[in-house]
Amino acid sequence: PEYRRQRQMCIRDSHMPDEGDILIDGISTTFKTPRDAAVSGIGTVYQDLALQPLMSVTRNFFLGREISKSVFLDMNHMNEITRTEMAKLGIDVADPTQPIGTMSGGQRQTLAIARAIYFGAKVLILDEPTSALGQKQQLEVLRTVNQVREMNEIAIIFITHNDMHARLIGDRYTFLNRGRVLADGDRDEIDMDNLRALMAGGAELAELESEFQNTST
C-alpha cells in the first residue's frame, strides 16, 4: 500500500518522482500542491472518500468550492447542480439537504466521482473504490465507473486487488509489486488466468506454493 500511495502522490500532488515524467497534453508537468494537480485535471477519489458524514449531500459535493451569492451560500443553485450531476451517473437525490451519512456506501462513492468530474477531472484516480463495500454496493460503483468509462472523455486509473473488477473495467493493466512494474499490457494481451496470477503475486506465489509442497513431503 505504501508504494501505491507514493505513486498516487507523485501524480496528484507535490511528491517528485525519482525518474520519469508526468505528461499532460504532451507537456511535462510537476505539481507543488494538490490544488495544482486539481487545476490540471487530476481528480482523486480517496479510499476514505474525504466526505463529512454529518454534512449534507450538497455541502459535501461543494466542500471547499462553495458557490456564494452576495455574502451567503447559494444553496438553491448548489442543490440543483448536485441533483443534476448525480442524476447523470444514475443516482436520484430527492433531498440533497439530507446528511450524506444516510446514503449507501455505493452512493457516496458515486458522489465523490461526480464531484471530481464536475470540477474538471481529466484523469480520475480511484483508490480501491469497492474495497469496503458489500456486493450490491460494489455493483453500484462498478456501473458508475463504467458509465464514466463510456463517456470516452476521462482517463480512469482504477486501483484494485479484485481480479474480477479489474477485468470488468480495465482496458489496459499495470501490475505493481513493491513499487515496481511486474507486468503491463492491453486487455486483449492478458487473459483472465494471467490476470489472476499476476494480481496474486505471480512468481512469488509460485515460489511459495513450491515451498509448501516441499515442506509437506
Describe these PLM feature segments:
Residues 1-7, 11:
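Single conserved hydrophobic/aromatic residue that forms the stacking wall/gate
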Residues 117-122:
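A short, proline-enriched helix->beta-strand linker immediately N-terminal to the Walker B motif
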Residues 124-127:
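Catalytic Walker B motif of ABC-type/P-loop ATPase nucleotide-binding domains
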Residues 139-151:
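Helical segment within the ABC ATPase nucleotide-binding domain
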Residues 160-161:
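H-loop/switch region of ABC-family ATPase nucleotide-binding domains
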Residues 166-168:
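A short, surface-exposed alpha-helical micro-motif characterized by mixed small hydrophobic
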